[in-house]
Regions:
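Acidic (Asp/Glu-rich) sequence patches and key acidic residues
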Residues: 1-167, 175-177
């Protein structure tokens, strides 16, 4: 259970804590809609294909497409995926650093210190790079009842984006809705 993000960085949004558009709380950016996929085959619709009636890579004719879809088929031949995307450029780096500095003031200093100990690649949150931080959050949660997990989750996402921008100059990101 939970929603994922992927692209130049990857991970999972904190369940019940973090929205799919949390990037917008770090920098001034608006999400782009997700990809469109053809019904039937699931291929991604290219922008110049939006006026087509079926995927021409997978079907020889509209009739072949309709045969597979069934005679009851109505509506658009493609669906929008339940995702949003961001193309973050290094123009946002200064604003991101300012946001991270503000977040640090709201987070238990032990957690910030643990995050700052990470000197390796943070692009893949599934690699265990945040394991020490996660364990510390669990310990501190037992001490403090009203710790703002949303701020901690946002800070971790922001650090991933920051490292990606510093390394690549941009950060492309898809977020599951």
């Amino acid at each position: 259970m939970g929603r994922y993000y992927w692209g130049d960085i990857e991970g999972k949004f904190w369940f019940g804590v973090q929205s799919s558009s949390d990037v917008e709380n770090l920098i001034n950016i608006t999400a782009q809609p997700g990809n469109m996929i053809w019904q039937g085959c699931g291929c991604v619709v290219d922008f110049d294909q939006k006026n087509d009636e079926y995927c021409k890579d997978c079907y020889d004719s509209k009739e072949a497409f309709l045969d597979e879809m069934g005679e009851e088929f109505e509506g658009d031949p493609y669906d929008e995926l339940p995702e949003i995307s961001y193309n973050i450029t290094d123009d946002s780096l200064e604003d991101l650093c300012d946001a991270l500095t503000k977040l640090e003031k709201e987070i238990d200093p032990r957690i910030v210190t643990e995050y700052k100990k990470i000197d390796g690649d943070m692009s893949n949150a599934f690699s265990g790079v945040f394991k020490q931080v996660d364990e510390l959050v669990g310990i501190i949660l037992k001490e403090k009842e009203n710790m703002d997990l949303q701020v901690i989750a946002r800070y971790g996402l922001g650090l991933q984006i920051k490292q990606c921008l510093e390394k690549n100059g941009s950060c492309g990101l898809y977020c599951e809705l």
